[in-house]
Amino acid sequence: MGRCEFYHPFTPYRIQLELMQQIYGLLESGKKMGIFESPTGTGKTLSLICSTFTWLREHKAGYLQGSTGAQDSEEDSEDEPAWVKENYEQSVLADVTASMRAYEQRLAAVDTDLLVKGAAKRQRVEVAVERPDDGAEFLPDAYHSDVEERPSHAGGRGQLRKQLDADIKRLLRKLDEPDAADKSRLAANPLKVYFASRTHTQLGQFAAQLRLPQFPPSLAGLEQERVKFLPLGSRKQLCIHKKVSKVKSDGINEACMDAVSKSECSFFSAAREPDIIRQFQDQAFSTIQDIEDLVGIGNTLHACPYYSSRELIEGAEVITLPYQHLLLENARKTMGIDLRDSIIVIDEAHNLIDTINSIHSASISLTELRQCKLALQAYLAKFKTRLNSGNRVNLLKLIKMVDVLSQFIETQYKNGKRINDPNDIFMGTSMDVVNIHKLEKYMKTSKVAYKIDKYIQATTSNDLQDRGSRDIKQPILFKVASFLKTLANPSEEGQFFFENGHVLKYMLLEPSEVLKSIVTEAKCVILAGGTMEPVNDFFTQLVPYLAPTDVTTYSCGHVIPDDNLNAFIVSENFEFTFANREDIALIERLFHFIYQLASRVPFGMVVFFSSYKYIDFVVKTWTDRGLLSRLDAIKRIYHETSDGADVLKGYSETIQSEKKGAILLAVVGGRLSEGINFENELARAVVLVGLPFPNMFSGEMIVKQQHIKEKVIRNGGTQEDVNKAVREFYENICMKAVNQSVGRAIRHASDFANVYLIDKRYSGPRIQQKLSDWVRKRIQSASNIPKILSDTEAFFSGKGL
């Protein structure tokens, strides 16, 4: 019998208790990683919070004691008798307890409304400086060759002196407040839980869930210890500067740095003040605050929430952050994130491999390069006489680089073709990788991408329209800058290649190296998700360097009763392979099954197809033969389209207002299969048509397949091993998508639905083994269509429908 007390705010279900025991046991074991599958609707987030934070609070005292006494050398302690050491440790613990108690009392005295009430009196007014409309705001700072700062330049000296004056003033203020450092240290926490997820909404939901449990203090002498929670966000989420906050996400970082460097942001200046930071910290830690709350505190204190929150990292116990803040090493360094001895929880981890590959990849199309050249030429024509020589020379070099890339794509393009040496791009030109490094540094230092895109967005010049650049107002310069950065610093684990549509792309092929530094630093990394099967991808692609004994894997069941879900494999005369999926007889058989099913399933049915193109083909085939109207008479038909039109609203309203219900035709991997919950009447049936294998002829898949082949051969494998590895790769991508789509149906403990997998290949043991466990164990024995339809009728009849 494992541990039973995790301070869960409700009486946990058995599977929730088992999940918490597994996670707590992982942290106790000292293993480096755990992979946990907990279906949506099973209270996964609360289970993660309660298990990890219970462990943290129970072990925090030892870490506090160790870190406080770390200044004493081991040699001194070896000469001391045991009773001296014990008395010293008790003394240290008493000091820590007193400090923490004092800090909790300070937080208890924080009036969260007080600052708001007095804000009007204290708030400094940020005066917008009126400037003549001469285009000066679009000009980059003077740039001198490849040197970022020139001490001999008068302007540079002035800027440097201004920065030094500000730093000196800040240091003097700290000297005038000898207790400031001590007060900060009161809130320092040596143990942390970092919780990363994909979207702002998911992180906000975590904050809401964190408010529910009540945890005991970490030290016996404390009456209360608040959860010190900090949500880290992007500038886009946290900026309160009137002008900068309106900049599009691509340019907001450079817009912020531009305002800071020119001392045009009083919010940033305030965020460097020790007293303001102390107030911000007390407000943030006095209760559980989400991103929007931090923005409110920043507005009240007239201090930048983005920079202020970074000062609070040391004092936090629980930190939420977007994937990028965790997975990009430069982002961690910039934010001051130290992962040593921390517990890292990565939620929605079924996306982790794709996310790592995506954020470390870059691409540029021939069309985008042409748009970029138009923008650069228009900018130079407007400001040529006002740019210093350093800017002019580098902008001309940038145009030359764009020409080189364009010419390379035009002459060398072939879908899936690999570029093994980036220097091949510059063959026969005057450019090389050294030039790329210099240009990448220039764009970063001068912030010229932000300046040019700002100008292009602001201008209404007819000249731009005449030159055929209707889409020139898109922030193309940032995409070019990102690609140049990748071109200058490609990883050995990546590959340049051509993708369909005259696109030059760089893709990371080995995500394990990105995660390795995180796994090495952290105490433990927990990967959690609703649909983690097939899990062997995580071992082969993410942590091949970890022994299986260092990884705990656990898949918990669903909270629903066994009879709330049936899974049927509809194999009779159905096989949607690439070769025959457009067979008209097959499409007609599909219609007849869906038609019969629709008359037996109440309310909503969601039918998933492999692609938008295939939905269009099926709908057209049914329409041409007069079949769609027959189906529409039973249930209203809606289908997801590639243009992003919102069909969910109409689908939902029809189910609520019309007794017959509706059918939604959706795409596996599309927006409706990933981000939408089809609970209750929205999906009493989920249907999967075929197996959604990726397009093996796309440039990306061609390159990945070749990489797998070379990797297997390099490790001594045979051609048979290659074939097996490639097949496994494609099947895993397919079945992750299937599991994600099926998981849309059951969203809470009393929900119920049926799942229909239409393809005889689902009958194979290898494919079934890759289904989520809670679906696999509910596969029914019925295989012929009449029996499946009969069982369907009985299922819903038993539910009173």
Swiss-Prot record:
Where does motif DEAH box map?
A: 347-350
Localisation per UniProt entry: Nucleus
Entry binding sites for [4Fe-4S] cluster: 239, 256, 265, 304
- A Pfam family of the record is DEAD_2
Cellular component per GO, a single term: chromatin
Show the InterPro entries listed in the entry.
ATP-dep_Helicase_C (IPR006555), DinG/Rad3-like (IPR045028), Helic_SF1/SF2_ATP-bd_DinG/Rad3 (IPR014013), Helicase-like_DEXD_c2 (IPR006554), P-loop_NTPase (IPR027417), RAD3-like_helicase_DEAD (IPR010614), Rad3/Chl1-like (IPR013020)
Question: Which GO MF terms are attached to this record?
Answer: ATP binding; ATP hydrolysis activity; DNA binding; DNA helicase activity; iron-sulfur cluster binding; metal ion binding
Q: What is written in the cofactor note of this entry?
A: Binds 1 [4Fe-4S] cluster.
Q: Which domain of life is it from?
A: Eukaryota
Q: Which residues bind ATP?
A: 38-45
- Would the keyword Translocase be found if you checked this record's keyword annotation? no
Q: Which SUPFAM superfamilies would you find in this protein's record?
A: P-loop containing nucleoside triphosphate hydrolases
Every copy of the Helicase ATP-binding domain together lies at 2-412
UniProt cofactor(s): [4Fe-4S] cluster
GO terms for biological process, alphabetical: establishment of sister chromatid cohesion; interstrand cross-link repair; mitotic G1 DNA damage checkpoint signaling; mitotic sister chromatid cohesion
> Which keywords does this chain's UniProt record carry?
ATP-binding, Cell cycle, DNA-binding, Helicase, Hydrolase, Iron, Iron-sulfur, Isomerase, Metal-binding, Nucleotide-binding, Nucleus
- Which Gene3D superfamilies does the record cross-reference, listed alphabetically? P-loop containing nucleotide triphosphate hydrolases
The family annotation for this protein states: Belongs to the DEAD box helicase family. DEAH subfamily. DDX11/CHL1 sub-subfamily.
Q: What does this protein do?
A: ATP-dependent DNA helicase important for chromosome transmission and normal cell cycle progression in G(2)/M. May have a role in changing DNA topology to allow the loading of proteins involved in maintaining sister chromatid cohesion in the vicinity of the centromeres. Has a specific role in chromosome segregation during meiosis II.
This protein's name: ATP-dependent DNA helicase CHL1
Naturally occurring in which organism (per UniProt): Eremothecium gossypii (strain ATCC 10895 / CBS 109.51 / FGSC 9923 / NRRL Y-1056) (Yeast)
